[in-house]
Amino acid sequence: SLDIILNHNVDSLFNYQGDNVFYLSIAKQLVQLRLKLIELLINKDQQKLPHIIRQFVGLGIGLTPSGDDYLVGLMAFLLLKEHPAFAFYPDFYQGIIQSKSQTTPISAITLEKALNQEYRENMQQLIQMLVDAKETNIYPQFLEILNIGSSSGSDMLFGLRDALYLTHYFGENYVD
């Protein structure tokens, strides 16, 4: 399952196990922000959502920082038009648009595309498989995403896993 894949993946800052103080600091921030974001979504606290989303943008290292990749994975499923959490779209939009100058140009473009539900083909396929909820083996699709960049794929999958958790919380029968 996705949990097994992510728990054994050490490339993501969400799972950082090393002793680099800088990475440890970012990893701690990412985990704290992730928990806060999930809490705000569950409590439907739309007032504070843009502020938390802004803190994710640009957080991490590389061409597409971990915080950005996490948001891309989260939005891929959570902001589907028929999803009960689609009501949070304006908050994600506001948070990302206000903070896109905090990240790399390529990541800013990726985040904007994610707001429009535009993803690379393998992510689109994975989302479609999850929406269709057919009893097919999607493990190969998870692995394809996992292999994107040095940590981008695993960071996106962390976001997707949280989106699936929240979908279960909000009631998955609303997703078309």
Residue ranges and their predicted role:
Residues 1-176:
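Non-transmembrane, aqueous-exposed alpha-helical and coiled segments at domain scale
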